[in-house]
Swiss-Prot record:
Gene3D superfamilies: 2.60.220.30, Death Domain, Fas, Immunoglobulins, Thrombospondin type-1 (TSP1) repeat. This is Netrin receptor UNC5B-a. Disulfide bonds join C72-C133, C84-C131, C177-C228, C261-C298, C265-C302, C276-C288, C317-C351, C321-C356, C329-C341. The gene is unc5b-a. GO terms for biological process: anterior/posterior axon guidance. One of its GO terms (cellular component) is plasma membrane. Keywords: Cell membrane, Developmental protein, Disulfide bond, Glycoprotein, Immunoglobulin domain, Membrane, Receptor, Repeat, Signal, Transmembrane, Transmembrane helix. It is a single-pass type I membrane protein. Residues 1-30 form the signal peptide.
Length: 943
C-alpha cells in the first residue's frame, strides 16, 4: 500500500486531466466515457473485467465549517477519479491508496477527497452538490452512484410551538408541534416534566406522524409541563413549555332524604340537601350548577284531644235499686294522635236513698255474675273474628290459584292457535270514538298497505277515523262485506289480540313521544334476528357475493346504491375470502331505532364477520337524510351477536377510540370499517326541524277487466333499495309504475301525510272514497319500520267502454311541503311501465377484482403516498390533500394509520366509483403545488 502523491505520477495525471477537460467527444458505448483519451501507457489486459465498486461514496452533511470526506474503492481499477457537479476534481485533491487483495490477487484501489463548505456554497442552481466516482480498467469505465453533500443546519425557531391548555378529565387533548426547518430533517421527541414520553410504555399518549402529541383520555396525573424537542446532527432545540391542566368539573352527590317537617303542627317545611363532591371541582373546574338544597311545603295535622259530651239523663231505677247515666268522647273526637278522654264513661248511683230492700250480699252476687257474663261475651267475639279472618285468607288463596290456572290455560290456547294459523291472527275489534266530529263509519276506510303480501304478523285496528287512515295488517285478509276501501299494515303487532292500549291509538299519543311501532315489532323479531345473524342465508334477491384476495376489489349490489370496496392489501397475502353483502328485510330484523330516532338507510350485513383485515374496507350505503339542515344527530349502529344494536359512532363526536370514519355525502354514507358486520344509519332531530327525503310512487293495475280501478300511492324512503322493493312487490301483484316517482321533504313535526284525489271526470268515473282525504300517521313514516306504506284510491267507471282516466293526486304533509301528480292513464293490455332503473341496467356487474376495481393505477398511488405521507413543514402533505378532497372532518383518524394518504385515496375511490374522474384528484394535487405528481399521473396514466 502506498500514496500516489509523487512528482512523476502528478505530471502524468495533470496531462490526462487537461486532455479530458479540453476535449468534447462522444463515448463509444453506454457506460464508457472518455476511454479513447486515456494514455496508451496505461496497463490493460484483455481478460480484465469492468471495475467493480467495493465502496461507493455516501451522502454527507457539512457540520459548521468541517469538510466531509468522500471515499470510494474499486477493483480491478487502474485509475479512479471523482467527478463533482459534472466537473472532474483536480488530481492533486485525490488521496489514492492501493493494495493487493489476498484472495483474488487483484489490485484494490481506494480514492478519497474532501469537500469543503465553500465548495458547496459556491454552487448555483436548484440541485444539491453531488459527487461520484469513475473507475477505469482495460475493459472500460464504471460510475458509482451519486452522493449528495449538503450543509447541515437546524433553525432556531419552531414553525409551531405547543400551547398550554385546560382539558376536562377523560377528554382528548392535542398538543401541536412543527419543528424548525433543518437538514437533515429533525427528529422530534416530547418531554413530560423533563422526562421523555414513550408511547409504547404509556399507551395513553400518541405521537402522530406529523409530530403532534395526543393525550387520548386525560388523567389527573397528566397535569404537567410538556416540551417539544427537535434535534439533528447540528443542534438540539426546545420549544417553549406548554402547561396542561386536567380539571375536574364538580358533580352533585345524591339528594339526602327529606327531613321531617319542621313544624309538628300546621304548615311547615321539609328540606333535603346535596353537596358538590361527586366529584369535587379540581384544578379550576366549574362548580356544580343548580340548587344545593330544596324545600318542600308540608302540612302536619295538629293532634286533637278528645272531649266528653254532657252526661245523659239518669235512667229509670232498676231492680238493683240503681240508675245509670252515660257520656261519649266525641266533643271533639280524638284525632291525629290526640289524647283520649280521661274519666268514666258510665256513672251509677243508688236511686232509693238507701231504702233498697236487697241486702248487700245479694247485690254483690249480682255484680259478680254480671262481670262473668261480660268476660264470656268477649271470648266468643274473639273466636268469631279469628274464624272470619281464616275464611277470608282461604278465599284469597283460592282466587289467586284460579286466576293463575286460567292464565296458563289462555296461554296454551293462544300458543295452539298461533301454531295452527302460523302466527296470523285477524282481529275485528274496534273501539268507537265519539269525541271526534270527523268520524264516519268504520266500513268506509281507505287502503293503507305496508309490505302487502310479505308480512304475516298480527293485525289490529288502530283508530276508527273517517277522514284519517286506520292501519290494519295484511292484504291477504278477505275484505268485510260491502267494504270497498281496504286498509293494511305490516308492523302493528300486539302481544294479545283484541286488547289495545288507548295511548297507542292514532291521534292519542302524547306530544313529545312516538308510538313504539318498532318496539312492538322487535319483541316478535328478536329470536328471528338471532337466527338470522348466525345463519345469514344467501338469498340471491337480496344478497351478492364475491371472492377476493390481496389485490382487493369491489362488491356492488346493483340498483341499491350499496357497495363494499376492499383496498389492495386489506386481505393478507395468499388469503382468499368469499365476501357478501345482504340487505336485511326489516320485518325479520330487530330495528336499530329507539325513542324518537328514525332509520335513514337500509340495514346492511357485510361479511363474513371476524375476518382478519390489514386495512379498513369502505362500506357505501344510501341514506334519506336531508343533510342541508343542521338539526340531525346522526349515528352509525351495529348489531351484536346477541341481536342488540350498539352505537358505533355519533358523527362529529369522534375520538381516538372511534373504530371507524364516516364520510357523509348528500345521498350516501361511506364508512371505513375495520370489522365486518350488520350496520344501519339512524338519526334524531335536535329541535323538531330535521327533514328526511321520501319518494312518492303511483301504481296502477297492468290489466283491469272490472269496473273498479285502484290507484296506489306508495310513500317510501328516498333510497334505491326501497323503490326497488316496491317495484318487485307490485310486479308480483300485477301493477305497474305510472310515472316517475317524485321527491317529498318530510319534516319531523308530528304532522301526518295527507293524500287526496281531484278533477275526476264525473261523467265517466266516481270515487268510492267517502272522506275528503286519507292520512298516513306521522310516526308510521318517521320511524322507518314500515317499508311499503301506501294508500289506495278505489275508483269505479260507469262502463267498461271508459278506457281513459285523467285526475290529480295531491300528497302533502300537513303544514308542510307537498307534490301534485297529473295522471293520464290508459286501461290497455300493452301499457308500458316507467322503469327508474333502466339507465343502470348496464351496470349489473357485481364483482370487480384487482386493478379493474380502482380508478387510480397502483404505481401512481404509490408515488402519491410516498410524496405525501411524510409531514411537511409547509403543510402540503396528506392533511392538505384531505382538506382539498373535503375529507378533513376528523384528521386524527387518518393520522393513526400507517399510510394516511393511502386511506384517503381508498375513500376517494369509494366516493368516485361512478365517475372515476382523475381530474378532481389532479386538480387537488396542482393546488397543493405537487406538479411533479401531475406529470406522473399524465405519463403513468397513459400506459
Amino acid at each position: 500500500m502506498y500514496l500516489s502523491r509523487n512528482p512523476s505520477g502528478a505530471a502524468l495525471a495533470a496531462i490526462l486531466v487537461a486532455l479530458i477537460l479540453s476535449c468534447n467527444f462522444p463515448s463509444s458505448t453506454a457506460g464508457i466515457e472518455y476511454s479513447d483519451v486515456l494514455p496508451d501507457s496505461f496497463p490493460s489486459a484483455p481478460a480484465e473485467s469492468l471495475p467493480h465498486f467495493l465502496l461507493e461514496p455516501e451522502d454527507a452533511y457539512i457540520v459548521k465549517n468541517k469538510p466531509v470526506e468522500l471515499v470510494c474503492k474499486a477493483n480491478p481499477a487502474t485509475q479512479i477519479y471523482f467527478k463533482c457537479n459534472g466537473e472532474w476534481v483536480n488530481q492533486n485533491d485525490h488521496i489514492t491508496k492501493e493494495r493487493v487483495d489476498d484472495v483474488t490477487g487483484l489490485v484494490v484501489r481506494e480514492v478519497q477527497i474532501e469537500v469543503s463548505r465553500q465548495q458547496v456554497e459556491e454552487l448555483f442552481g436548484l440541485e444539491d452538490y453531488w459527487c461520484q466516482c469513475v473507475a477505469w480498467s482495460s475493459a472500460g469505465t464504471t460510475k458509482s452512484k451519486r452522493s449528495y453533500v449538503r450543509i447541515a443546519y437546524l433553525r432556531k425557531n419552531f414553525d409551531q410551538e405547543p400551547l398550554g391548555k385546560e382539558v376536562a378529565l377523560e377528554q382528548e387533548a392535542l398538543l401541536q408541534c412543527r419543528p424548525p426547518e433543518g437538514v437533515p430533517p429533525a427528529e422530534v421527541e416530547w418531554l413530560k416534566n423533563e422526562e421523555i414520553i414513550d408511547p409504547t410504555k404509556d399507551t395513553n399518549f400518541l405521537i402522530t406522524i406529523d409530530h403532534n402529541l395526543i393525550i387520548k383520555q386525560a388523567r389527573l396525573s397528566d397535569t404537567a409541563n410538556y416540551t417539544c424537542v427537535s434535534k439533528n446532527i447540528v443542534a438540539k432545540r426546545r420549544s417553549t413549555t406548554a402547561t396542561v391542566i386536567v380539571f375536574v368539573n364538580g358533580g352533585w352527590s345524591s339528594w339526602t332524604e327529606w327531613s321531617p317537617c319542621n313544624n309538628r303542627c300546621g304548615h311547615g317545611w321539609q328540606k333535603r340537601t346535596r353537596t358538590c363532591t361527586n366529584p369535587a371541582p379540581l384544578n379550576g373546574g366549574t362548580m356544580c350548577e343548580g340548587q344545593q338544597y330544596q324545600k318542600f311545603a308540608c302540612n302536619t295535622m295538629c293532634p286533637v284531644d278528645g272531649g266528653w259530651t254532657e252526661w245523659s239523663k239518669w235512667s229509670a231505677c232498676s231492680t238493683e235499686c240503681t240508675h245509670w247515666r252515660s257520656r261519649e268522647c266525641n266533643a271533639p273526637t280524638p284525632k291525629n294522635g290526640g289524647k283520649d278522654c280521661s274519666g268514666m264513661l258510665l256513672d251509677s248511683k243508688n236511686c232509693t236513698d238507701g231504702l233498697c230492700m236487697q241486702n248487700k250480699r245479694v247485690l254483690g252476687e249480682t255484680k259478680s255474675r254480671l262481670l262473668e257474663s261480660t268476660g264470656d261475651v268477649a271470648l266468643y267475639a274473639g273466636l268469631v273474628v279469628a274464624i272470619f279472618i281464616v275464611i277470608i285468607l282461604l278465599m284469597a288463596v283460592g282466587i289467586v290459584v284460579y286466576r293463575r290456572n286460567c292464565r296458563e290455560f289462555d296461554t296454551d290456547i293462544t300458543d295452539s292457535s298461533a301454531a295452527l294459523t302460523g302466527g296470523f291472527h285477524p282481529v275485528n275489534f274496534k273501539t268507537s270514538r265519539h269525541d271526534n266530529s270527523q268520524l264516519i263509519h268504520p266500513a268506509m276506510q281507505p287502503d293503507l298497505t305496508a309490505n302487502a303480501g310479505i308480512y304475516r304478523g298480527n293485525m289490529y285496528a288502530l283508530q276508527d277515523s273517517a277522514d284519517k287512515i286506520p292501519m290494519t295488517n295484511s292484504p291477504l285478509l278477505d275484505p268485510l262485506p260491502n267494504l270497498k276501501i281496504k286498509v293494511y299494515n305490516s308492523s302493528t303487532v300486539g302481544s294479545s289480540p283484541g286488547i289495545h292500549d288507548g295511548n297507542n291509538l292514532l291521534g292519542t299519543k302524547p306530544t313529545g313521544t312516538y308510538p313504539s311501532d318498532n318496539n312492538i315489532m322487535n319483541a316478535r323479531n328478536k329470536n328471528m334476528s338471532m337466527q338470522h345473524l348466525l345463519t345469514l342465508p344467501r338469498d340471491s334477491s337480496n344478497s351478492v357475493t364475491g371472492t377476493f384476495g390481496s389485490l382487493g376489489g369491489r362488491l356492488t349490489f346493483p340498483n341499491t346504491g350499496v357497495s363494499l370496496l376492499i383496498p389492495q392489501g386489506a386481505i393478507p397475502q395468499g388469503k382468499y375470502y368469499e365476501m357478501y353483502l345482504m340487505i336485511n328485510k326489516r320485518e325479520n330484523t330487530v330495528l336499530p331505532s329507539e325513542g324518537t330516532q328514525t332509520i335513514l338507510s337500509p340495514i346492511i350485513t357485510c361479511g363474513p364477520t371476524g375476518l382478519l383485515l390489514c386495512k379498513p374496507v369502505i362500506l357505501t350505503v344510501p341514506h334519506c337524510a336531508d343533510i342541508n339542515t343542521s338539526d340531525w344527530i346522526l349515528q352509525l349502529k351495529t348489531q351484536s351477536h346477541q341481536g342488540n344494536w350498539e352505537e358505533v359512532v355519533t358523527l362529529n363526536e369522534e375520538t381516538l377510540n372511534t373504530p371507524c370514519y364516516c364520510q357523509l355525502e348528500s345521498h350516501s354514507c361511506h364508512t371505513l370499517l375495520d370489522q365486518l358486520g350488520t350496520y344501519a344509519f339512524v338519526g334524531e332531530s335536535y329541535s323538531r326541524s330535521a327533514i328526511k327525503r321520501l319518494q312518492l310512487a303511483i301504481f296502477a293495475p297492468m290489466l283491469c277487466t272490472s269496473l273498479e280501478y285502484n290507484l296506489k300511492v306508495y310513500c317510501v324512503e328516498d333510497t334505491p333499495d326501497a323503490l326497488k322493493e316496491v317495484l318487485e312487490l307490485e310486479k308480483t301483484l300485477g301493477g305497474y309504475l305510472v310515472e316517475e316517482p317524485k321527491l317529498l321533504m318530510f319534516k319531523d313535526s308530528y304532522h301526518n301525510l295527507r293524500l287526496s284525489i281531484h278533477d275526476i271526470p264525473h261523467s265517466l268515473w266516481r270515487s268510492k272514497l267517502m272522506a275528503k282525504y286519507q292520512e298516513i300517521p306521522f310516526y308510521h313514516i318517521w320511524s322507518g319500520s314500515q317499508r311499503t306504506l301506501h294508500c289506495t284510491f278505489t275508483l269505479e267507471r260507469y262502463s267498461l267502454a271508459a278506457t281513459e282516466l285523467t285526475c290529480k293526486i295531491c300528497v302533502r304533509q300537513v303544514e308542510g311541503e307537498g307534490q301534485i301528480f297529473q295522471l293520464h292513464t290508459l286501461l290497455e293490455e300493452n301499457v308500458k311501465s316507467f322503469d327508474p332503473f333502466c339507465s343502470q341496467a348496464e351496470n349489473s356487474v357485481t364483482t370487480h377484482l384487482g386493478p379493474y376495481a380502482f380508478k387510480i393505477p397502483f404505481s401512481i398511488r404509490q408515488k402519491i403516498c410516498n410524496s405525501l405521507d411524510a409531514p411537511n413543514s409547509r403543510g402540503n402533505d396528506w392533511r392538505l390533500l384531505a382538506q382539498k378532497l373535503c375529507m378533513d372532518r376528523y384528521l386524527n383518524y387518518f393520522a393513526t394509520k400507517a399510510s394516511p394518504t393511502g386511506v384517503i385515496l381508498d375513500l376517494w375511490e369509494a366516493l368516485h366509483q361512478d365517475d372515476g374522474d382523475l381530474n378532481t384528484l389532479a386538480s387537488a394535487l396542482e393546488e397543493m403545488g405537487k406538479s411533479e405528481m401531475m406529470l406522473v399521473m399524465a405519463t403513468d396514466g397513459d400506459c
